[in-house]
Curated annotation (Swiss-Prot):
Name the record gives this protein: B-cell CLL/lymphoma 9-like protein
Comp. bias intervals (Low complexity): 348-360, 1046-1059
Post-translational modification Phosphothreonine, affected residues: 511
Species classification: Eukaryota, Metazoa, Chordata, Craniata, Vertebrata
Compositionally biased spans, kind Basic and acidic residues: 114-126, 134-153, 396-418
InterPro entries: Bcl-9/Bcl-9l, BCL9_beta-catenin-bd_dom, Znf_RING/FYVE/PHD
Expression across tissues: Expressed in kidney, liver, lung, testis, brain, spleen, heart and skeletal muscle. Highly expressed in numerous colorectal tumors compared to corresponding non-cancerous tissues.
Biased composition range(s): Pro residues: 20-37, 279-289, 299-322, 1119-1129, 1165-1176
A GO MF label: transcription coactivator activity
Assigned keywords, A-Z: Acetylation, Activator, Isopeptide bond, Methylation, Nucleus, Phosphoprotein, Transcription, Transcription regulation, Ubl conjugation
GO biological process terms, semicolon-separated: canonical Wnt signaling pathway; myoblast differentiation; negative regulation of transforming growth factor beta receptor signaling pathway; positive regulation of epithelial to mesenchymal transition; positive regulation of transcription by RNA polymerase II; regulation of cell morphogenesis; skeletal muscle cell differentiation; somatic stem cell population maintenance
Ranges in coiled-coil conformation: none
């Protein structure tokens, strides 16, 4: 609206500016030239700090250019239109990948379009403002010349034109960079548009205050026309002109009423200004003037004070928040007083001032917030939202206001998509970091300054200046992390404050009605928050985080703006929503009402409130728990179990039930948010909600959400999602569910990311998509899917409309399914994804809900896809990511649920998918149902395969995903990552790392999460054998998924995996810890990877892989290594956990499914063991497995390996045909089962996969080959029993079978008499992602060598292991198989993975799955590696590879397991590459599997 109006007008002026500086000479700063330089630099900055400040940079740059425009990035984009936007698009490309290409692209496209339209239209529109135009043209020439001339000057940085450009260019690197740092992670780019839009709005209010300063500045820069010769003063004075102001000034100048725009502005304070001016001008003027004197960041901090006045109005509303307001002002002011704060915060550095200058140049000032606001994003965004409304309402004509409102809504949508994830992240980050931190986070360094200097309030808010920096770093690394940290602390607080401030600020400019509305909203939010808090879904923070992380991603934007919650939640909502600051509320809103609002009209709105809270809470909880996705997973799982117990989300259950609307909405909203996040991330990131997400999933979980994710989110989702979160939510599978579910579903973050994250949130999107598609899954898919997947999902959702059908169920329905699946949980959603719910519920729900899931399966294919990329992880989960994510979240966004979702969801989802797949694949649909629960469980894997099968779908989606993945390997990693979302967030890395971890995370996390929940939930769930299977799996998956969620967190997942692995119980803690540690790098890499990955993937991915491997893998390795022992001890613990689960599972599910699944699930849990075993893949796994074996291990192994295990391993290759088939199947199936389950379980699958395929299975198999095999066979048999012999090839794995059966795969993989599927490389490679595959293949080659040495190492380990356990030998055989496999190729080096792949086709199936995973992205790499190895070993490499591509798809789709497996494989390889231990440790899950297997 205003933004648009501004945008439109500005673009107009800007456009004119392009020709000539518009009267808005301050805007003049935006001359194309500066903009361009800015953009180029921006590009540079952005590219350079894609992860970093790309977002901010872009925003700032874009904003700068656009700043002129409206200071709305979007506007800028519009203004810059093609130019900025294109550059922005580049940034966007980078960023979009980060921010969620879809959303941003969407944003970009939308914004660009709108802006272009605004620009063009705007010009025409503005034509209505001919005087402005004329003036703009008149002034433009002057200003422009001035700017240009000044710009020609060495970028005084003072000049509006030049300053922002140069300074912003420079500063953007610094400030923008900083901001960007926060932003990119935050998806500020998108935030930018929204934020910018908001900022303009903010600026509207800010303009008043800032106008004071601006006038001062203008005097300083009068000659410069904002040229701001006193470069610093302009820097110091950030004149934020609303479009209205700028236009008015221009008009006045044209009319001769004013000498200059500056004079006019100085003389005339807009209403907002007057509202604020009294508050601001006094301070602002003096301050700004002083500031000029201060002329330094101090000066800008003073501007901050003006912004406080700007918020001044807000202060009254927000007096307590006065400091917060100051902070808000720091935050908002960055946003609102963007000029000031922008100047202050932004101007903290002269560069920031440049930002401020840019802001100045952005007379609309909307941009300043955007520029600093980028950082402000969180701040500005919230503020922006409020201010946006504020501004939006401020001086525009009714028409413009309406337009602006629409634009705002659009922006808000985008914001929510992008910003939601970005915003929340920024919010979490920036706001958490501090408002200044928001910007400052970007400018952490500067933020440090501004916070100190500017921070009267800023500091207060910035209690976290360091955090700001951290935020920045994390922002960089993984916003999910940051925002979680800051977000949590400040998220709620600040969020509220910010929100309130925003609202209040917004109120400044807002009309009384709006103010009233806002107030109501605030009250509503607060009430909701209280409710939520009461709901205790776990503090809104997690939601915030989740939302922030995943939620961010999966903000409610889609619903809100789609549904018009925006209308309902007008700016307030936007603001509030947008203010992830008030993440809880806003977030809630955003996720909840907004989310639900539109998405679940009314209902959700209503519910969301509760669920908003719930959503928020859960999300937050997960965030909390997910705090790292891991914990959230646990938290949720724990909580869930407690809460949901069986339902897994009591709340959810209740809510879900209550609302399955709610829960599901909850979930959905959350998931959606996560998704969004993933989308954003990826992503996250995925198009989070298909609608928005899909569309908006520009973000995309990421974690590209994710993890935009990715991530964040990181999930997710970070984002699982965390993500994905990103995490996060993802990680908190519960949250994860959000993230995991959302991101997780998306956690991504994980998202995947996370939200998958982002596959870009494909994961999340995937999840989202899934969640959307399945609503559950679709949502997740969407979240995970984000852009690609979003698209895919869209297609799939739409295309697989059937999925959509089922998935299309409605988001609600899907969500419901998801909810049911999630049964309990959001986590459920994640978990829903979780086989648990998913399988169980999912299976039932999805199985029954298979509709949904059938769709899911198909969708799952998507989901896998979605997950695959993002939610591959998420699912990885199906929601493979997150953030992480998201769900994305890798399992986080990975499966954002992604991760968790992915895993959870992925698992669940995927299992669902798988189940469906399997069901579909069907082998015994019912059996599958039940078994498929297993199947589903492995289904996830299988699903992956199935999904793979779905592959048709998946392939289609997946392929796209893969395609995305091919690019996607790059992207896929991203997507995968994103998809992993969570994984994505760690996406690539996560995917690599997190995915590895994440997937493993899911496994591990599953272990942890599930492990804990597993036992609890698992037991909980397990009791329901079905559910057990499913549930257990779900649990495991949940665990896995939650891990995914962690995966969403990506980093966390990896850590989590370690942790998870490390402590099934501890997982969360450990994971979280590792996650955090991992997160920064992991997330950062993930996010970077996620964002940058597409192009960088190979290099970056490899680097990430390396880093991930080194870092995460090693890291997990360490944890894992310790865990291994623990797994041995703990393994038992884990094993217990897992075994527990395993036992539970095994016991409950011991039967083929329960046990297998559970076994797998336990495996999943055990994957921690397995994972641990990873580290101790042999040892832990063995012992663990033995434990598991004896206990659940048997089952587990049995399940895992049993089918593939001893048999396969034993007769790794012998049985491969039959037992191995089964085994293979188990490996594969198991992989599908174990793998799938693992995959589904994410880690579990992976682990299971690994165990299944590897030690565990062997061991288990040996121990329980009969039982397990039967069970597994049962499981497998379910999928594989029949298939065992022949079925094996076909039923080799449900997943593999699916894969084999997969229409696409069928061509590629053809059952052989031996039961070893042969992969027709010619088909496959060309098939899904030849390049990706190839790429990875080479990667693989690189790693394979590495891998092989590690492999050798592994072999040694395995040998040791083999020697260790006679029983193990089989297991080892798996491992031994590796050895043997290696030696005996047939055995499946990674029984599943490599060898399995190589040795055992089933394993290949698995491997494909694994490869798939590997193939997916990192997985792919691994896959490739595996394949490579396989190829080498088996010569199946190609085939395997082939399958992997296929499987990849599916497996990618497979998410965790695949990713895990892939990761496992990839990681294994990678990890192997990195280190056996690492691989074992990190990859162990994936690596473990592959590793061990290898």
């Amino acid at each position: 609206m205003r933004i648009l109006a501004n945008k439109t007008r500005l673009p107009h002026p800007r456009r004119r500016e392009a020709p000539g500086s518009p009267p808005l000479s301050p805007r003049g700063h935006c001359p194309p030239a500066p903009a361009k330089p800015m953009h180029p630099e921006n590009k540079l900055t952005n590219h350079g700090k894609t992860g970093n400040g790309g977002a901010q940079s872009q925003h700032q740059n874009v904003n700068q250019g656009p700043t002129c425009n409206l200071g709305s990035k979007g506007v800028g984009a519009g203004s810059h239109g093609a130019k900025a936007n294109q550059i922005s698009p580049s940034n966007s490309s980078l960023k979009n990948p980060q921010a969620g290409v879809s959303p941003f692209s969407s944003l970009k496209g939308k914004v660009k379009r709108e802006r272009s339209v605004s620009v063009d239209s705007g010009e025409q529109r503005e034509a209505g403002t001919p005087s402005l135009d004329s003036e703009a043209k008149e002034v433009a020439p002057r200003s422009k010349r001035r700017c240009v001339l000044e710009r020609k000057q060495p970028y005084s940085g003072d000049e509006w034109c030049s300053g922002p450009d140069s300074e912003e260019d420079d500063k953007p690197i610094a400030a923008a960079h900083n901001c960007n740092v926060a932003d990119p992670a935050m998806v500020t780019p998108q935030l930018g548009p929204g934020q910018t839009a908001q900022l303009p709005l903010s600026e509207s209010s800010a303009p008043g205050p800032q106008h004071g300063p601006q006038p001062g500045l203008r005097p300083d820069v009068p000659g410069g026309g904002g040229g701001g010769v006193p470069g610093k003063p302009p820097s110091q004075f950030v004149y934020v002109f609303t479009t209205h102001l700028a236009n008015t000034a221009a008009e006045a100048v044209l009319q001769g009423r004013a000498e200059s725009i500056l004079a006019y502005h100085q003389q005339n304070v807009p209403r907002a200004k007057l509202d604020q001016a009294p508050k601001v001008p006094p301070t602002p003027e003096p301050l700004p003037l002083n500031t000029p004197s201060a002329g330094t960041p101090q000066s800008q901090p003073p501007p901050l004070p003006p912004p406080p006045p700007a918020p001044g109005s807000a202060p009254p509303a927000l007096p307590p928040e006065g400091p917060p307001e100051d902070t808000s002002q720091d935050l908002a002011p960055n946003s609102v007083g963007a000029a000031s704060t922008g100047g202050g915060t932004g101007g903290t550095h002269p560069n920031t001032p440049t930002a401020a200058t840019a802001n100045n140049p952005l007379p609309p000032g909307g941009d300043p917030g955007s520029a600093p606001g980028s950082a402000l994003l969180g701040e500005a965004t919230p503020t922006g939202n409020g201010q946006r409304n504020l501004v939006g309402s401020e001086g525009l004509s009714k028409e413009q206001l309406e337009h602006r409102e629409r634009s705002l809504q659009t922006l808000r949508d985008i914001e929510r998509l992008l910003l939601r994830s970005g915003e929340t992240e920024p919010f979490l980050k920036g706001p958490p970091g501090g408002a200044g931190e928001g910007g400052p986070p970007a400018q952490a360094p500067s933020a440090a300054q501004p916070p100190p200097s500017a921070p009267p309030g800023g500091l207060k808010k910035y209690e976290e200046p360091l955090q700001s920096m951290i935020s920045q770093t994390q922002s960089l690394g993984g916003p999910p992390l940051e925002h979680e940290v800051p977000g949590h602390p400040q998220g709620g607080d600040m969020g509220q404050q910010m929100n309130m401030m925003m609202q209040r600020l917004g109120q400044d400019s807002l009309t009384p009605e709006q103010v009233a509305w806002r107030k109501l909203q605030e009250e509503y939010y607060e009430e909701k928050r209280r409710k939520e808090e009461q709901i205790g879904l776990h503090g809104g923070r997690p939601l915030q985080d989740m939302v922030g992380m995943g939620g961010m991603m999966g903000r409610g934007p889609p619903p809100p703006y789609h549904s018009k919650p925006g209308d309902q939640w007008p700016p307030g909502m936007g603001a509030q929503l947008r203010g992830p600051m008030d993440v809880q509320d806003p977030m809630q809103l955003r996720p909840g009402p907004p989310f639900p609002g539109p998405r679940f009209p009314g209902n959700q709105m209503q519910r969301v409130p509760g669920f908003g809270g719930m959503q928020s809470m859960p999300m937050e909880v997960p965030m909390n728990a997910m705090q790292r996705p891991v914990r959230p997973g646990m938290a949720w799982n724990e909580d869930l179990p407690p809460i949901g117990g069986p339902s897994n989300f009591a709340q959810n259950a209740v809510p879900y039930p209550g609302g399955q609307g709610e829960a599901e909405r909850f979930m959905t909203p959350r998931v959606r948010e996560e998704l969004l996040r993933h989308q954003l991330l990826e992503k996250r990131s995925m198009g989070m909600q298909r609608p928005l997400g899909m569309a908006g999933s520009g973000m995309g979980q990421s974690m590209e959400m994710e993890r935009m994710i990715q991530a964040h989110r990181q999930m997710d989702p970070a984002m699982f999602p965390g993500q994905m979160t990103g995490g996060d939510g993802l990680a908190g599978t519960p949250m994860g569910i959000e993230f995991g579910g959302g991101r997780g579903l998306l956690s991504p973050p994980m998202g995947q990311s996370g939200l998958r994250e982002v596959d870009p949130p494909m994961g999340p999107g995937n999840l989202n998509m899934n969640m959307n598609v399945n609503m559950n899954m679709n949502m997740n898919l969407n979240v995970q899917m984000t852009p690609q997947q979003q698209m895919l999902m869209s297609q799939k959702m739409r295309g697989p409309g059937d999925m959509m059908g089922p998935q299309g169920l409605s988001p609600e329905e899907m969500a419901r399914v998801r909810a049911q699946n999630s049964s309990g949980m959001m986590g459920g959603p994640q978990k829903m994804l979780m086989p648990s719910q998913f399988p169980n519920q999912g299976q039932q729900g999805f199985s029954g809900g298979q509709g949904p899931y059938q769709a899911m399966p198909q969708d799952m294919g998507n989901t896998p896809d979605m997950f695959s990329p993002d939610q591959s992880s998420v699912p990885m989960g199906t929601v493979g990511t997150a953030r992480l994510s998201h769900m994305p979240l890798p399992p986080a966004s990975n499966p954002p649920g992604s991760v968790h979702l992915a895993s959870n969801r992925g698992l669940g989802r995927r299992p669902s998918d798988l189940t469906i797949s399997i069901n579909q694949m069907g082998s015994p649909g019912m059996g599958h149902l039940k078994s498929p629960t297993l199947s589903q469980v492995h289904s996830p894997l299988v699903t992956s395969p199935s999904a793979n099968l779905k592959s048709p779908q998946t392939p289609s989606q997946m392929v796209p995903l893969p395609s995305a993945n091919p690019p996607g390997p790059l992207k896929s990693p991203q997507v995968l990552s994103s998809s992993l979302g969570v994984r994505s967030p760690t996406g690539s890395p996560s995917r690599l790392k997190s995915p590895s971890m994440a997937v493993p995370s899911p496994g591990w996390v599953a272990s942890p999460k599930t492990a804990m929940p597993s036992p609890g939930v698992s037991q909980n769930k397990q009791p329901p054998l079905s559910i057990n299977s499913s549930s257990t799996l779900g649990n495991v998956e949940q665990g896995a998924l939650p891990p995914s969620a962690p995966r969403n967190s990506s980093s966390a997942p990896p850590a989590n995996p370690s942790s998870g692995l490390m402590n099934p119980s501890l997982p969360f803690t450990s994971s979280p810890d590792p996650t955090p540690s991992q997160n920064p790098l992991s997330l950062m890499m993930s996010q970077m990877s996620k964002y940058a990955m597409p192009s960088s993937t190979p290099l970056y991915h490899n680097a990430i892989k390396t880093i991930a491997t080194s870092d995460d893998e090693l890291l997990p390795d360490r944890p894992l290594l310790p865990p291994p022992p623990p797994p041995q001890g703990s393994g038992p613990g884990i094993s217990n956990n897992q075994p527990n689960q395993m036992h539970m599972n095994p016991a409950a599910a011991q039967s083929p499914m329960g046990m297998n699944l559970p076994g797998q699930q336990p495996l999943s849990h055990e994957p921690p063991p397995t994972m641990l075993p990873s580290p101790t893949p042999l040892g832990s796994n063995i012992p663990l497995h033995p434990n598991a074996q004896g206990t659940g291990g048997s089952s587990q192994n049995s399940m895992m390996m049993a089918p593939g295990g001893p048999d396969s391993l034993n007769a790794p290759c012998g049985p491969v045909p039959s037992s191995s088939q089964m085994m293979s199947f188990p490996p594969r199936l198991q992989q599908p089962h174990g793998a799938m389950a693992p995959t589904g379980a994410g880690g579990p699958g992976l682990q299971q996969h690994y165990p299944s395929g590897m030690a565990l299975p062997p061991e288990d198999l040996p121990t329980q080959p009969p039982g397990p095999i039967p069970p597994q066979q049962h499981l497998m048999g379910k999928g594989m029993t029949g298939r065992m012999g022949d079925a094996y090839p076909p039923g080799v794995l449900p997943g593999v079978a699916s894969v084999l059966n997969d229409p696409e795969l069928s061509e590629v993989i053809r059952p052989t008499p031996t039961g070893i599927p042969e992969f027709d490389l010619s088909r496959i490679i060309p098939s899904e992602k030849p390049s990706s595959t190839l790429q990875y293949f080479p990667k693989s080659e690189n790693q394979p060598p590495k891998a092989q040495p590690p492999n050798l190492h592994l072999m040694n380990l395995q040998n040791m292991m083999a020697e260790q356990t006679p029983s193990r030998p089989p297991n080892l055989p798996g491992q031994q198989g590796v050895q043997r496999g290696l030696s005996m190729s047939m055995c499946h080096p990674g029984q599943m993975s490599l060898l399995g792949r190589t040795g055992v086709p089933p394993q290949q199936g698995m491997v494909p799955h694994g490869l798939h995973q590997g193939v997916m992205s990192p997985p792919q790499g691994l896959m490739t590696q595996q394949n490579f190895m396989l190829m080498k070993q088996r010569g199946v490499g190609g085939e395997v590879y082939t399958q992997p591509p296929h499987m990849l798809s599916p497996q990618g789709s497979l998410m965790g397991p695949p990713p895990q497996q892939n990761l496992m494989v990839s990681h294994p390889l990678r990890q192997r590459s990195v280190s056996l231990d690492s691989q074992m440790g990190y990859l162990p899950t994936p690596g473990s599997m592959a590793n061990l297997p290898f």
